[in-house]
Swiss-Prot record:
Residue stretches making up the HIN-200 domain: 193-393, 566-765
Assembly behavior: Forms homooligomers. Interacts with TMEM173, AIM2, PYCARD and CASP1. Interacts with BRCA1, TP53, E2F1, RB1 and SP1. Interacts with MTA1. Interacts with MTA1. Interacts with PYDC5.
Protein name in the entry: Gamma-interferon-inducible protein 16
Name of the coding gene: IFI16
Region ranges (Interaction with TP53 C-terminus): 192-393
Length: 785
């Protein structure tokens, strides 16, 4: 009998509670078990169960554990479960004592029992008890924010996540209302509010940010649209999942910052930060390191068979593999699996019909565990969120396909000697033909990417490029290939294939990567193979230059020369919220005639910085109206540009006080660089500006414009759709997103790329002052776009 009791204590009691509650249990048992400080810190659940068996002869401490759980509001349901298990172990049918137990329990109010039990049949007595509970818990519940009382992830449960000792979190956090093993369908459908005991913490807590999600939009029961994000933070002894309902704090939760949080709500191990909360960065003397064991717990995902044993109502966080996806009218069923079982995830609202496919990883935030007919299901609620990590393409793991690009890169094209110009190898310093794979892909310092990733990258570059055929071998020198300059050896492939951490690897990054591979270069393919080594693959542009944005931004904001480098190297989806003012935007244009893909360029600014933006969602054109203040999130930083895709969030902002952009900053954003400055800049950067056409020459599929000012001349090479523009000598070209490419004599030339845009400004040839080379050098803000 005692063995049965110990099984219940360990497997159905201690095993399912979270770290926070386990530490609480150890503290409450410290006198009985003679636990000193070191033992309370180090003893695990098995050791505590052993001590309880030794101390409490007869029931292995089960009765004591039930009493402790009953005194913890969010564990009351678990206490009832243990009482039933104890009766079973005694050989008594639970049904016999059910009424008696309910009556005995009714006096004790429980904030976590306000919702109808998830069990199947609740007796009238049980229902009455719940009603009483609800009334008594009212005052305390009033402390909780309006949003908290909504069905979305009760905060209390939030901390009990599947991630990082999450199993337990679920129990405590989820304790909200659901207790039984099965769930009433109506309860799930309505997703009733689950009032739980929350405590307003005035005193500050110092934590380190471990990870954050991107901001996302959710809908309140009042049909109001709001934005929030999730975060994980930790002290030196425990971690917390955080719901941040104030997105203006996103910057505070970036990186691995040490921050101080005050006036937050706490339920168990979950923190909620809202408009009333205060968040500030910690001082130098408040820095600390989080132990690896805490970090690992925070990242931990519970096995599905463990989830099936968890109490209904728990909140779950974790990363799971998608086995099957079924889309209904208002819900989506995601069947997840691991090596221990399967489970359904029901997504509604923002979690409905997320773009994903079998084999992808779903990172779930704040999902409620529900039970019906002994079957467990994860249900999305108001604050739930799903982040997608795309599966790896199997073909990239094939040894043959991985070797192919390297072998090809070492075989020069037979026609190379006879068709290339002397300038065709001017970019070899950036990509030496003798060591194509090392100089092309390796990082100059930290070697964080393995050979396999290099081969995969080469395979992708080879397969995804869509350059037409034989064009380059016969008509142009190597430098007319636009994208080679963008890949110096110092720009590792890490920015292309990897992201800063697992939580930044998502569908957005994969979508961005594939989009770039398909669109970023449009010069015919054979050109590259016929004039130079394999490093000249068309997609080189995806590897940002060593100082990509510095050279790009110096064309219009010299003081940012050292800042953009980090931005352009990241080459990944950015989840931070950036508030900017729109300075100007081009008209929408078709950049991919075959598929009729459209985009437009824009310039935006904060009060300190200016950013060039590529917008691939023309539905946002109205948002990018000059002088509008907008917030952008989930954008992509690449090569000195912010790239806005369909998954990017763009919203109007009523700035108070109104954002004021310094006039000097606006002027710097609209300055056209002098040609002698361009000649000395790093090749591979991108240039915007207004230039006068001195000569025009059409050769085959290319159009060459010679532009000039009072400091020199330069050639602009145009290919594809832009060759059809109506432009004559003496006109002015307003160039947007032209690549500065190398040329013999180290003068360089500007080349059109797939996202380039030209606007022709017609001039009167009889007015020489308009033809003055200097007249296009300084432009007004309105004139630039």
């Amino acid at each position: 009998m005692e063995k049965k009791y110990k099984n219940i204590v360990l497997l159905k009691g201690l095993e399912v509670i979270n770290d926070y509650h386990f530490r609480m249990v150890k503290s409450l048992l410290s006198n009985d078990l003679k636990l000193n400080l070191k033992m309370r810190e180090e003893y695990d659940k098995i050791q505590i169960a052993d001590l309880m068996e030794e101390k409490f002869r007869g029931d292995a401490g089960l009765g004591k554990l039930i009493q402790i759980f009953k005194d913890i509001p969010t564990l009351e349901d678990l206490a009832e479960t243990l009482k039933k298990e104890k009766l079973k172990a005694k050989g008594l049918a639970p049904s016999r004592k059910r009424k008696k137990e309910v009556d005995a329990a009714s006096p004790a109010p429980s904030t976590s029992s306000t919702v109808k039990t998830e069990g199947a049949e609740a007796t009238p007595g049980a229902q009455k008890r719940k009603k009483t509970t609800k009334e008594k818990s009212g005052p305390k519940g009033s402390k909780v924010s309006k949003e908290q009382t909504q069905p979305p992830c009760p905060a209390g449960a939030g901390m009990s996540t599947a991630m990082g000792r999450s199993p337990s979190p679920k129990t405590s956090s989820s304790a909200p209302p659901n207790t039984s093993s099965t769930e009433n369908p109506k309860t799930v459908a309505k997703c009733q509010a689950t009032p739980r005991r929350s405590v307003l913490q005035k005193g500050p807590v110092i934590v380190k940010v471990l990870s954050t999600t991107k901001p996302f939009e959710y809908e309140t029961p009042e049909m109001e649209k709001k934005i929030m994000f999730h975060a994980t933070v930790a002290t030196q002894t425990q971690f917390f999942h955080v719901k941040v309902l104030n997105t203006s704090l996103k910057e505070k939760f970036n990186g691995k910052k040490i921050i101080i949080i005050s006036d937050y709500l706490e339920y168990d191990s979950l923190l909620e930060v809202n408009e009333e909360s205060t968040v500030s960065e910690a001082g130098p003397n408040q820095k600390f390191e989080v132990p690896n064991k805490i970090i690992n717990r925070a990242k931990e995902t519970l096995k599905i068979d463990i989830l099936h044993k968890q109490a209904s109502g728990n909140i779950v966080y974790g990363v799971f593999t998608l086995h099957k996806k079924t889309v209904n009218q208002k819900t989506t069923i995601y069947k997840i699996q691991d090596d221990r079982g399967k489970m359904d995830v029901v997504g509604t609202g923002q979690c409905h019909n997320i773009p994903c496919e079998e084999g992808d990883k779903l990172q779930l935030y704040c999902f409620r565990l529900r039970k019906k007919n002994q079957m467990s299901t994860l249900i999305s609620e108001m604050h739930s969120f799903i982040q997608i990590k795309k599966k790896t393409n199997p073909r990239n793991n094939d040894p043959k396909s991985m070797k192919l690009p390297q072998e090809q890169s070492q075989l020069p094209n037979p026609s190379e000697a006879g068709t290339t110009f002397p300038e065709s190898h001017l970019w070899t310093p950036q990509m030496p033909p003798t060591t194509p794979s090392s100089s092309f892909f390796t990082k100059k310092s930290e070697d964080t990417i393995s050979k396999m990733n290099d081969f995969m990258r080469m395979q992708i570059l080879k397969e995804e490029s869509h350059f037409p055929g034989p064009f380059m071998t016969s008509i142009g020198p190597a430098e007319s290939y636009p994208h080679t300059p963008q890949m110096p050896p110092s720009t590792p492939s890490s920015s292309f294939l990897t992201t800063k951490s697992e939580d930044t690897i998502s569908k957005m990054n994969d979508f961005m990567r594939m989009q770039i591979l398909k669109e970023e270069s449009h010069f015919p393919r054979p050109f590259m193979t016929s004039i130079g080594p394999a490093e000249s693959y068309p997609h080189t542009p995806q590897m940002p230059p060593s100082t990509p944005s510095s050279s790009f931004l110096t064309t219009w904001k010299p003081k940012l020369q050292t800042e953009p480098e980090e931005v352009s190297i990241e080459d990944s989806a950015q989840s931070d919220l950036k508030e900017v003012m729109v300075l100007n935007a081009t008209e929408s244009f078709v950049y991919e005639p075959k598929e009729q893909k459209k985009m437009f360029h824009a310039t935006v600014a904060t009060e300190k910085e200016v950013f060039r933006v590529k917008v691939f969602n023309i539905d946002l054109k109205e948002k990018f109206t000059p002088k509008k203040i907008i917030a952008i999130s989930n954008y992509v930083c690449r090569n000195g540009f912010l790239e806005v895709y369909p998954f990017t969030l763009v919203a109007d902002v009523n700035a108070d006080p109104k954002m004021e952009i310094p006039k000097g900053l606006i002027r710097s954003a609209n300055i056209t660089p002098k040609i002698n400055q361009l000649c000395s800049q790093t090749k591979g950067s991108f240039v915007n500006g207004v230039f006068e056409v001195h000569k025009k020459n059409v050769r085959g599929e290319f159009t060459y414009y010679e532009i000039q000012d009072n400091t020199g001349k330069m050639e602009v090479v145009v290919h594809g759709r832009l060759t059809t523009i109506n432009c004559e000598e003496g006109d002015k070209l307003k160039l947007t997103c032209f690549e500065l490419a190398p040329k013999s004599g180290n003068t360089g030339e500007l080349r059109s790329v797939i996202h380039s845009h030209i606007k022709v400004i017609k001039t009167r040839k009889n007015k020489k002052d308009i033809l003055n080379p200097d007249s296009s050098m300084e432009t007004s803000p309105d004139f630039f776009f």
